[in-house]
Swiss-Prot record:
SMART domains with a match to the protein in the record: NDK
Location, primary (coarse class): cytoplasm
Entry protein name: Nucleoside diphosphate kinase
Pfam families: NDK
Species of provenance: Desulfosudis oleivorans (strain DSM 6200 / JCM 39069 / Hxd3) (Desulfococcus oleovorans)
Enzyme class: transferase
Record: residues binding ATP: 9, 57, 85, 91, 102, 112
Cell compartment(s), UniProt: Cytoplasm
Length: 139
């Protein structure tokens, strides 16, 4: 079984999309094995997105991600990373496939409702960033 991190971003929380995201995860057969709502500080957002520190969007991304509450979840399932990334859709919602979360709900590239890990190593780092082993209800 593979694990991945999901974040419902501040725009998704503000717009009341948590339930819709969870519904789609469960419909896809991805098991939620940890979940909590947090409000990241700017420093936490900068640490989480440190890999993008030199990118031109780093400042706006970390400001946005610390602008309101988010819901972080650990998902588990066969090929969980690929399945969740497919469910999310392309980062740029205009390029996302019909029926994906981002195509259906995003309003701009940064306010694209959800985040998901892109690889097993990334998932391990991201899950550990928000959860300790006692908070994860896996097998």
């Amino acid at each position: 079984m593979e694990r991945t991190l999901s974040i419902v971003k501040p725009d998704g929380v503000e717009r009341g999309l948590i339930g819709e995201v969870v519904r789609r995860l469960e419909k896809e057969g991805l098991k939620i094995i940890a979940m909590k709502m947090i409000h990241m500080t700017r420093a936490q957002a900068e640490g989480f997105y440190a890999v993008h520190r030199e990118r031109p969007f780093f400042e706006s991304l970390t400001t946005f991600m610390s602008s309101g509450p988010v819901v972080v979840m650990v998902l588990e399932g066969e090929d969980a990373i690929l399945r969740y990334r497919t469910l999310m859709g392309a980062t740029n919602y205009k390029d996302a496939a019909e029926g994906t979360i981002r195509r259906d709900f995003a309003t701009e590239i940064e306010r694209n409702v959800v985040h998901g890990s892109d690889a097993p190593d990334t998932a391990a780092f991201e899950i550990g960033y928000f959860f300790n082993s006692f908070e994860i209800m896996g097998r």
